[in-house]
Regions:
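Cationic, low-complexity basic patches in intrinsically disordered or flexible, solvent-exposed regions
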Residues: 9-10
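Class I S-adenosyl-L-methionine
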Residues: 2-3, 20-128, 139
Length: 249
């Protein structure tokens, strides 16, 4: 009788453990990888990636860490698939897995954190944790010297989510208020003249000799930095991997 009872208890414990495992809900880390170099990834970001079983992100960003974390399951999507990536992260977490959603720079600055929290309202069981990273504004500033010593404004020239009219208003407002301005996403194939337009707005309030700078591929292979005037910057060709700095009076 004692043996039978012991076997029944053992079976009950096994069933209980299986139910607990089936009901386990995972966690999503939203991780800022920094500008790109391994040395610029924070210890907290590295630790969160070590804890994660699944890594999700834009193809370029997952490619930056595959070699360092080869034992993870990787799920990648091309650009403009942000909602799909969030859905993938939540689906994996609902299976009980620990997930890392990776972004360049800082996840809360033009990253995935906001969208994940918005979509996370439909998954109240899933725990979200934002892991901060070094954003391009900081990384590029360190390359140039110290352009962000006082008040400054960070503005993205991408009009995918923000109408250009609103971006123009923000540029003019920052220039009129004499902020140092840091520009993200200054150009692309479809927005080749956006930096020139931004400089023209700023020239209405600032001198053509205003000191400016830009850094391409911050913290990555082929990093390139230049210091020039605002009038020179207006006619400079840059790309989406460039961060631009415009000084003040």
């Amino acid at each position: 009788f004692c043996i039978i009872r012991s076997l029944q208890q053992s079976s009950d414990r096994a069933k209980e453990k299986k139910v607990q495992e089936m009901c386990k809900i995972g966690k999503v880390y939203v991780i800022g990888l920094g500008p790109g170099a391994e040395k610029e990834m924070t210890y907290q970001a590295s630790t969160a990636l070590e804890k994660s079983e699944v890594v999700i992100g834009y193809t370029v960003y997952t490619g930056l860490i595959r070699e360092r974390f080869p034992d993870k399951k990787y799920l990648s999507t091309p650009m403009r698939q942000e909602v799909v990536r969030c859905e993938m992260a939540m689906d994996e977490a609902m299976k009980g897995r620990t997930v890392a959603m990776v972004c360049s720079g800082d996840a809360g600055i033009y990253g995935m954190a906001g969208l994940l929290y918005e979509m996370g309202q439909g998954y109240p069981e899933v725990e979200l944790e934002v892991v901060p990273g070094i954003t391009a504004a900081n990384g590029g500033a360190a390359v140039l010297g110290a352009p962000l010593m006082h008040d400054f404004a960070v503005i993205s020239l991408s009009d995918l989510l923000t109408p250009w009219e609103k971006i123009e208003k923000r540029i003019r407002g920052a220039a009129m208020a004499d902020f140092v301005i840091c520009l993200y996403n200054p150009s692309s194939r479809k927005r080749a003249d956006y930096l020139k337009k931004a400089c023209e707005y700023i020239l209405e309030y600032q001198s053509p000799d205003t000191v400016c700078g830009y850094v391409r591929n911050i913290g990555r292979e082929g990093e390139d930095a230049h210091i020039l005037t605002l009038s020179e910057l207006k006619d400079t060709e840059v790309d989406m991997f460039t961060t631009v700095y415009i000084g003040n009076s």
